[in-house]
Amino acid sequence: MMYSVVRGLLFTVLVLNNLIAGANAPVSQPAKPTVLLIKKYTTTINGKSSELFKIEQPDGTWGFHGVKGQMFDAIVKNQTDKPTAVHWHGLVVPNDQDGVPYITQAPIPPGGEYHYHFPLKQSGTYWMHSHHDLQVQQFLSAPLIISDPDEVKSTKEVILLLGDFSFKKPELIFAELKHGQMAHMHHGGGMASVDGKHATPDLNDVAYDAFLTNYRTLKNPEIVSVRPGDTVRLRFIAGSAMTNFFINIGQLQGEAIAIDGQSIKPVKSNQFQLPVGQRLDVLVKIPAGEKAYPILAQGEGTSMQTGLILATPKATIPSMKEQADSTVGALNYDQELKLKAVHPLKPKSPGQTLLVNLEGDMMSYSWTINKQVWPHIKPLQVIANKRVEMVFHNQTTMAHPMHLHGHVFEVTEIDGKAIKDGAMHDTVLVLPNSTVKVQFDTDNPGNWMMHCHMLYHQEGGMMTLVNYKGVAMPPLTMTHEMHS
């Protein structure tokens, strides 16, 4: 009954939005709908049985692999006992397909289903995940890979979906954060304050029990078979709730070719940075000889690591440690400053500037945008068909990976340093006490979430809406009442 009421309340608003925003017409022949099952998944982590979520197709295929130019036509079936919805992170979709409960749709009730249908306009590495409650912490997520039919394919593709795991329920973690029980934990730094001006950087709020790659720890890592001479495309997805990662591909030479699904001019290295919510595509070539090649990700501010192993057929598989030899520090802007988009925005002066102040208080665990806590917000309003500059000013001692739904944006400036042809993103990391400027075109009308992708920062209030002028707003009070 409750879900019927919610759907009824949303119907009028969503119909009006669609009339104004317009629905994108199919660009390719429709295919038979793919069925995506949201289900409970039991696994063993550090010797203990743990129940998580998983999104897979009836034949066991994890997530979704599509082709640019075709239709995404999927029926999501909720086989759990919790309401949910699925957001297609990084994809530019019609607003009513964005998968945000109470904003673009009612939640999918237990035993219910929802049909998503939209054209695939992009290619690259994306991911799908719940936007309901704290379900991302329990791995309600999956890869979403879109191939480009015109792109030269690698010999092999390997997905690494990185996650942070706790034996505690996410609701308990958040309650402890709200009551200050984790406030002094800080693996990597000092105490956060309201203004952040006189405090040392804070790297971690949550003490995790393990980091996982594709649901597995390094005690039992996935072994991927490769052959000498293979070109392997590593698709890294930071599907973690709160953990930024350093990527280490060891003895292999990597070439980063895409960030957030968007092509970049190649950057060669064997170490990369990957903030929460971002994706990174790295090419590696397997040398001659029989050998195993660990591909590792170490959590920012910790010695904990995760990963998998690439191995030739006769290679000896090494045993891997979950603890690195040393603790790593904080992510920085070095990598971002090097990234250059293959297809940057066409030069155009912004017609509007939006100031996005990021504030927070670690003791009360309240996180705000322009001093507003979700859902008690005044949306950032834009006008269709304009170039918009968005200025993120982080006034806290924590980094915030800021994600804008339904759009891609270009990084144009970091701490006063202009960047020509900066990388195109849907998620950008804004470091403590720093400023990042981005630009995007308002070419996708609707109401779009914009939030920190640190799960407990988002839950603590660091979320808002970008509203296109003339598009009716959903009833935001319902998001709070129904969530409570």
Please give the residue ranges for each predicted region.
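Acidic-aromatic/histidine active-site loop/patch
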Residues: I159-D230, I237
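N-terminal edge beta-strand
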Residues: T42-K68, Y208-R227, E359-R387
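Asparagine-centered strand-capping/turn motif at beta-strand->loop junctions
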Residues: V76-T80, F236-S240, F392-T396
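Hydrophobic or amphipathic alpha-helical targeting/insertion segments
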Residues: G112-L161
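Bacterial N-terminal signal peptides that target proteins for export
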Residues: M1-L9
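Extended terminal and domain-junction accessory segments
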Residues: N24-V35, K39, L140-G180, I264-T397, ...
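Bacterial N-terminal signal peptides
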Residues: G8-N18
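Extracytoplasmic beta-sandwich strand-turn segments characteristic of Greek-key/jelly-roll folds
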Residues: S50, D59-G66, F72, W88-Q122, ...
